[in-house]
Curated annotation (Swiss-Prot):
NCBIfam families: PRK09585.1-5. The lineage of its organism: Bacteria, Pseudomonadati, Pseudomonadota, Alphaproteobacteria, Hyphomicrobiales. It catalyses: 1,6-anhydro-N-acetyl-beta-muramate + ATP + H2O = N-acetyl-D-muramate 6-phosphate + ADP + H(+). It comes from Chelativorans sp. (strain BNC1). The gene is anmK. This is Anhydro-N-acetylmuramic acid kinase. Catalyzes the specific phosphorylation of 1,6-anhydro-N-acetylmuramic acid (anhMurNAc) with the simultaneous cleavage of the 1,6-anhydro ring, generating MurNAc-6-P. Is required for the utilization of anhMurNAc either imported from the medium or derived from its own cell wall murein, and thus plays a role in cell wall recycling. GO terms for molecular function: ATP binding; kinase activity; phosphotransferase activity, alcohol group as acceptor. Keywords: ATP-binding, Carbohydrate metabolism, Kinase, Nucleotide-binding, Transferase. The keyword Transferase applies.
Length: 377
């Protein structure tokens, strides 16, 4: 197909109160052009509602009926993101007919990886048909369920987009891409070989630790961590966690590693220790790769944390660089990814692979809420 404009939406597990909206022109194989990008705020009450949904999800764990709050949160989230897309289109002089599709990831409230022969489970809040009705464009949503039902991890899905980005700059096996969101995930390529998995915690436990102490939603510029001292004995114990040395493919839920890891430490020392752990976990991940890269291109919010980036260079023994230095948009990459995956889904191209999620064969994913069915209704 000819490259077409698509919009991607992403809200991470850090619950920072924002929606990432990004537009790219793509055929689902290459990125032809980058369009506008916007960080749109949620209504102030929505992060609170989503936080309650996450709490209920942690209790539920796919046992029995879904918590009633899911329906309320899903409708509120979908409406907020749909209205943000409408504003985005209007601000950029666009109409729904100008875009091929919207890639709507939704909000992950619970993700349980497969284990000991048991299939995993995943739940993202996001009503594709409702968004299609509000915006007036085709919507691709529910990207992870098909992979999980086929025995895969359901994550990470971003590697195929990371590959398209690295192809633009000629990155080889000595370069990998690292996303630092709520959790960390890495993508590494060597010719046709592709490896990707979740490295461990990234921003989520640090943010939760800071919130717990009433110091805001995150460690601004890493100042709290930089004013503290890493508890090396605690860090050593944390690095004994079996996940870190487990073979890939593997994936994590936001709550797989929590702020409780720093319990008993001061605010500053806890932040420093959690930051060091997130970085050291990346080092363990690099050791698992077929060939250890010497350069990491870092995207996601974590790249803006000087304490985390410094610990990455020290604890992971790697050159860690902001992807913005390479003409990419580090804040937009995950949203761009779901625009890319939406087009791949429409074309029936795979979005998950044996080397990334452990699914038995490359497979497509996502469900389509088409404009024709919506308009007919």
């Amino acid at each position: 197909m000819e490259p077409a404009w698509a919009i991607g939406l992403m809200t991470g597990t850090v619950l920072d109160g924002n929606i990432d909206i990004a537009m790219i022109r793509t055929d689902g194989e290459k990125v032809d052009a980058f369009g506008p990008y916007k960080l749109a705020p949620y209504p102030p009450e929505l992060p609170i509602l989503l936080g309650r949904a996450l709490e209920e999800a942690a209790k539920w764990r796919f046992q029995g009926q879904e918590p009633a709050i899911f329906r309320e949160a899903e409708a509120a989230l979908t409406q907020a993101q749909a209205l943000a897309v409408c504003d985005f289109l209007r601000e950029n002089g666009l109409s729904p007919g100008d875009i091929k599709a919207i890639g709507f990831h939704g909000q992950t409230v619970l993700h349980i990886a497969p284990k000991d022969g048991r299939r995993g489970h995943t739940r993202q809040l996001g009503d594709g048909p409702l968004m299609a009705k509000i915006v007036g464009a085709d919507v691709v949503y529910d990207f992870r369920t098909a992979d999980v039902e086929a025995g895969g991890q359901g994550a990470p899905l971003v590697p195929i987009y990371h590959r398209a980005l690295l192809d633009r700059i000629g990155g080889g096996c000595e370069t990998a891409m690292l996303n630092l969101g709520g959790v960390g995930n890495i993508s590494w390529f060597d010719g046709d070989q592709m490896v990707a998995f979740d490295t461990g915690p990234a921003n989520a436990p640090i943010n939760d630790w800071v919130k717990r102490h009433g110091r805001g939603n995150f460690d601004t510029d890493g100042r709290i961590a930089l004013s503290g001292t890493v508890d090396e004995a605690r860090l050593s114990r944390l690095l004994d966690h079996p996940y870190l040395n487990a073979p890939y493919p593997k994936s994590l839920d936001r709550n797989s590693f929590t702020a409780d890891m720093a319990e008993g430490l001061s605010l500053e020392n806890g932040a420093a220790t959690l930051t060091a752990f997130s970085a050291a976990a990346v080092g363990r991940a690099l050791d698992l790769l077929p060939e250890r890269p010497n350069r990491l291109l870092v995207c996601g919010g974590g790249r803006k944390n000087p304490a985390l980036m410094a610990q990455l260079r020290r604890r992971a023994n790697v050159q860690a660089m902001d992807v913005d230095q390479f003409g990419m948009r580090g804040d937009a990459i995950e949203a761009e990814c779901f625009a890319f995956l939406a087009v791949r889904s429409i074309r029936g191209l795979p979005i998950s692979f044996p080397q990334t999620t452990g699914v038995s064969k490359p497979m497509s994913g996502g469900r389509l809420a088409p404009a024709s069915a919506r308009n007919a209704a």
